[in-house]
A protein has these predicted regions:
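Accessory cap/linker subdomain of secreted extracellular hydrolases
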Residues: 142, 213-317
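Glycine-rich nucleophile elbow surrounding the catalytic serine of serine-hydrolase chemistry
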Residues: 203-213
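N-terminal cap/lid segment of alpha/beta-hydrolase-fold proteins
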Residues: 78-122
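Short substrate-entry loop that stabilizes the transition state in hydrolases
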Residues: 117-124, 129-167, 331-334
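Glycine-centered loop-to-beta-strand initiation motif
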Residues: 21-33
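Gly/Ser-rich "nucleophile elbow"/oxyanion-hole loop immediately N-terminal to the catalytic nucleophile
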Residues: 115-123, 169-177, 183-205
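Short beta-strand/loop motif that positions the catalytic acidic residue
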Residues: 318, 324-326
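Short, aromatic- and glycine-rich surface loops/edge beta-strands on solvent-exposed regions
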Residues: 8, 39-68
Length: 339
């Protein structure tokens, strides 16, 4: 219900936070303040993590304070909470489509097969490009996808939750994005057109960084990754030496905020205008996307709760071959590569 005050309680009773549903009746909770408070807009989340915590996996209840009714139990999944294997039996066809992940969110995907006249019939070696840019844009393949396709690979471009035509709330480099990547790898690998039912990942910068988070979840069907031009710590990229990076990082986050709004990318709005009902439905919760540029500015001191988003803390879990390159462009102000 629009304007409803929804109180989140942990399984053992304490009230954690109350959120006010937006004009569409949507609400989203990913963080918990140090003390219970009412959050009436997504802009207020920016100040929560500076003193609060990430909402931990577990069982919760939601109480509608206007009616007293309780909804739940609501289970918050962890990356390790794997779905029933039947989820990975989805059939993916050439062209634009959607792939469902473990919490029911659908991600927009673009499947491109190689030229059969040059490379023969399926199955083909297959790679995934996964980011919040436009990897599932049917009319503009990303560089990694384009090159791989020309070299004889089947390519699957996947937009992260909350971006492009995908559903869900955008939360940069969150555990949910890593878990989604696991589900994407396992679903794609089971397609009959995938050689040896193994896939790799490609991409530079954003889709390069995302590979490291996904590989750290150890999807059994992942063969190798090729992360190019990556960073090691998003917070230190935004606060190098304790000084706010008002250059590239500020602009990059501001662009992510703009592009993840409803119809924020021209191509996703074009699909909606052309009658893509799934794309339109997936935009409904975009009002819950946070302002990440403001969010990052609010965290002017490093918090241990940010460790889950530090590439440096997850890469030791990767157990597949890695081809990694680094970069030192002028737009970056901190060491970018992982030692």
């Amino acid at each position: 219900t629009p304007g409803a005050e929804l109180r989140v309680e942990s399984d053992d009773g304490p009230s954690l936070v109350t959120v006010v549903a937006d004009h569409s009746g949507n609400a989203h909770v990913a963080f918990v303040p140090a003390e219970h408070k009412v959050i009436s807009s997504t802009e207020e989340w920016a100040d929560v993590l500076s003193t609060g915590q990430i909402l931990a996996p577990g069982v919760y209840s939601v109480v509608d304070e206007s009616t007293g009714s309780t909804h739940g139990p609501v289970r918050v999944l962890s990356v390790e909470d794997l779905p029933d294997p039947s989820l990975y039996r989805q059939e993916l066809e050439e062209g634009f489509g959607y792939l469902e992940v473990r919490d029911g969110v659908t991600l927009s995907i673009m499947v491109r097969f190689p030229n059969e006249d040059l490379y023969g019939p399926a199955p083909w070696p297959t790679v995934i490009e996964y980011s919040g840019y436009g990897p599932s844009n049917p009319d503009a393949p990303q560089p990694g996808s384009l090159l791989a396709n020309l070299l004889g690979f089947a390519v699957v471009g996947v937009n992260m939750r909350g971006t492009g035509c995908s559903g869900g709330v955008f939360d940069v480099f969150s555990p949910a994005q890593a878990a989604d990547g696991y589900d994407v790898v396992e679903t794609v690998a089971r397609q009959p057109w995938v050689l040896d039912n193994k896939v790799g990942m490609v991409g530079l910068s954003y889709p390069g960084i995302s590979q490291l988070y996904v590989a750290a979840t150890r999807p059994p069907s992942l063969a190798a990754i090729t992360p190019l031009s990556v960073i090691d710590d998003l917070w230190r990229q935004q606060w190098p030496g304790g000084t706010y990076n008002s250059g590239f990082t500020r602009a990059w986050l501001a662009q992510r905020d703009a592009e993840t709004k409803v119809g924020g990318m021209a191509w996703d709005q074009a699909r909606i205008d052309a009658g893509d009902e799934q794309a339109a439905a997936n935009q409904a919760i975009r009002s819950q996307n946070m302002d990440f540029e403001r969010f990052g500015r609010a965290i002017d001191n490093f918090r241990p709760t940010l460790d889950a988003r530090r590439v440096e803390t997850v890469v030791d879990r990767i157990d597949v071959p890695v081809y990694l390159t680094g970069a030192w462009p002028l737009r970056f102000t901190a060491t970018q590569s992982i030692a």
